[in-house]
A protein has these predicted regions:
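Flexible inter-repeat linkers and adjacent short helices
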Residues: 1-2, 16-22, 26-37, 41-134, ...
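Extreme N-terminal basic, low-complexity initiation segments
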Residues: 2-13
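Tandem amphipathic alpha-helical repeat scaffolds
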Residues: 62-80, 99-113, 134-150, 176-192, ...
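Helix-turn-helix repeat elements of alpha-solenoid scaffolds
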Residues: 73-89, 106-122, 148-163, 188-201, ...
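Solenoid-like repeat scaffolds
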Residues: 89-97, 122-133, 160-174, 200-213, ...
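Linker/hinge segments immediately adjacent to helix-turn-helix/homeobox DNA-binding domains
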Residues: 186, 210-348, 364
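Helix-turn-helix DNA-binding segment
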Residues: 333-382, 386-391, 397-402
Length: 402
């Protein structure tokens, strides 16, 4: 076999465990953890796009062999049933050390400790075990949005896409396909970037997920329906999910509660929305799971302000700081992919008011909802229009999420 160095358009490398590449009956020695132009990434290694057809079958079989070996689950803490305030104990009960470390990364992420999350999961981004890899990819993607590293987030987002593509092409075991699709939809739906045509529907694989992950996936499904503005149906999906639970899965239930409240506020069921968010907040409080509320702040349209702003001003300030950091990173991925650019000119409270104003809420209704005076709301709305350089409140829809 030849030890000639590969040219940039020929190939690329693997992880430390993949140090050679076979092309046209020649074996090349590769440089670990170096990626060359014109390559694509797969679990455990990279491969050249131009020479891909010559080795596709061999490489994909190796990828799928590694995927089949995994009997782990994706996002183990999301899938854990435990009483609120007992997240640390739930992690301690996970005997698999690597899975426990992923669960610790989840804890850091959901408790809005992005730097600790990234540090905890970074070593799993190239792991041969697809469940560990996908879990790390998701956490790394969203944590880096908060940290203002959109390029790092984009890399792991692409890795999830590639894992999904290969799992589907090679007809991987159904649990692997379900995990890949779950990871893909987590990122796509939260970024409000529609999946490519031909992507299998999420609901087709939800039954193959463990119950906790299944509940979280149902929250994604409801979120997807919400984005189609079918609020009553989305709310019904959430309510059905709560009925099928066999225990307390705090993380999934917090996300379900947020989506339900999003639907309720759009149906002008204000009291119900406030009650739903209050329940979700109480479920999150003991473990300090702030991240769901940071991610859903804008779509909750002022409900967080009603529930937390005056009652817990210090906690609300932490939420606001998190919202600002996360939303800036979110926009750097979302805006280039979509025709409409979501604005970063508004404060979290202004954004909440803007979300209500363009949906034909009157100043009086907004004031009553947020506990503000009508004059204060008028002042905010005028300031929003000025910042966005528009003259009518119905034009706000071009600058915010819907």
């Amino acid at each position: 076999m030849s030890n000639a160095n590969p040219t940039n358009d020929e190939l690329c490398i693997a992880s430390i465990t993949r140090i050679s590449y076979i092309n046209e009956c020649q074996e090349y020695t590769l440089c670990p953890n170096v990626r060359y132009p014109g390559t694509v990434r797969f679990p455990g290694f990279f491969c050249c796009v131009e020479r891909w057809n010559n080795v596709e079958k061999v490489i994909l079989q190796e990828v799928m062999k590694e995927m089949k070996l995994s009997d782990r689950v994706i996002l183990p803490l999301v899938g854990s049933a435990f009483q609120p305030g007992k997240a640390a104990e739930a992690i301690e009960k996970i005997k698999d050390k690597e899975l426990a470390q992923i669960a610790q990364g989840e804890y850091y992420f959901f408790s809005a400790q992005a730097e600790k999350c990234v540090e905890t999961v970074k070593d799993y981004l190239d792991h041969d075990d697809v469940m560990l890899r996908l879990s790390a990819d998701m956490l790394y993607t969203f944590a880096n949005l908060t940290l203002g590293n959109p390029q790092a987030a984009q890399c792991t987002r692409e890795d999830v896409q590639q894992c999904l593509t290969r799992a589907m092409q090679m007809d991987a075991p159904v649990n692997v396909r379900a995990a890949c699709l779950f990871a893909f939809y987590v990122i796509s739906i939260f970024l409000h970037i529609p999946p490519e045509e031909g992507t299998p529907p999420l609901q087709q694989y939800i039954p193959y997920l463990p119950i906790g992950q299944r509940l979280f996936a149902v929250s994604l499904l409801a979120h997807e329906i919400y984005l189609k503005q079918d609020y009553a149906n989305a709310k019904g999906v959430v309510q059905g999910a709560f009925l099928m639970t066999d225990g307390v899965y705090p993380i999934a239930m917090i996300y379900l509660g947020c989506v339900q409240a999003m639907c309720q506020i759009n149906l002008k069921e204000q009291e119900e929305a406030i009650q739903t968010v209050t329940q979700a907040w109480e479920r999150a409080r003991l473990d300090k799971f702030m991240e769901p509320f940071i991610e859903y702040h804008g779509l909750l349209q002022g409900v967080l302000e009603v529930c937390i702003r005056k009652k817990e001003p210090e906690m609300y300030k932490k939420l606001v700081d998190g919202v600002l950091a996360f939303s800036r990173g979110w926009m750097k991925i979302h805006n280039p992919k979509m025709q409409k650019a979501v604005t970063d000119l508004l404060s979290p409270l202004e954004y909440s008011i803007a979300m209500l104003a363009f949906r034909d809420w009157t100043n009086q209704e907004i004031a009553e909802h947020l506990g503000l005076s009508v004059n204060t709301v008028k002042h905010y709305v005028s300031g929003i229009l000025e910042k966005l350089q528009i003259d009518k409140r119905d034009k706000i829809k071009d600058f915010v999420n819907q």
